[in-house]
């Protein structure tokens, strides 16, 4: 039984779990949800807040902001594209946090189940790369000596153009 709060992350129906939330990401529950009888592989990627960024030591926390109305449709486009490229996907979850996150906290989850590991790894890699390139979520970094918007921001692309 999944333990996440339905008011925060609604019950999942179907085989795609797409969400933007200010609350803690359900790492263990998303893994359990992805396990399917016909799938021998589940790949779970959890992006966590690290203590440094390019040219910046001593990162203390990140604050994520998003264009809320556009996030889930973009996540849906990524899931759709992944299913076109890897039709054997059993389940796919794309979940991202907003708000202030301290070092070590999970900010993004990509979970993919497939019958075999190669496809699960490939699809998960595609999904996180497409999410980073096409979903309007931005991070503000706070470190010992100051703060600024993240240096790794890229222009927003369509999921289908990510290779």
Named regions from a protein language model:
Residues 1-107, 113-115, 121-125, 129-163:
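N-terminal, polar/charged subdomain of small-to-medium soluble alpha/beta proteins
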């Amino acid at each position: 039984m999944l333990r996440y709060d339905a008011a925060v992350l609604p019950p999942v129906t179907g085989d795609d779990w797409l969400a933007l939330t200010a609350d803690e990401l359900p790492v263990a529950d998303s893994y359990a949800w992805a396990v399917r009888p016909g799938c021998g592989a589940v790949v779970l990627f959890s992006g966590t807040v690290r203590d440094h960024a390019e040219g910046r030591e001593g990162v203390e926390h990140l604050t994520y902001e998003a264009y809320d109305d556009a996030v889930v449709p973009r996540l849906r486009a990524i899931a759709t594209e992944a299913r076109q490229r890897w039709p054997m996907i059993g389940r796919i979850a794309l979940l991202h946090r907003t708000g202030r996150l301290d070092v070590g906290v999970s900010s993004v989850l990509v979970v993919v189940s497939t019958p075999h590991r190669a496809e699960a790894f490939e699809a998960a890699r595609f999904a996180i790369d497409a999410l980073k390139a096409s979903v309007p979520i931005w991070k503000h970094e706070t470190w010992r000596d100051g703060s600024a918007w993240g240096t790794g921001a890229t222009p927003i692309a369509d999921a289908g153009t990510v290779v």
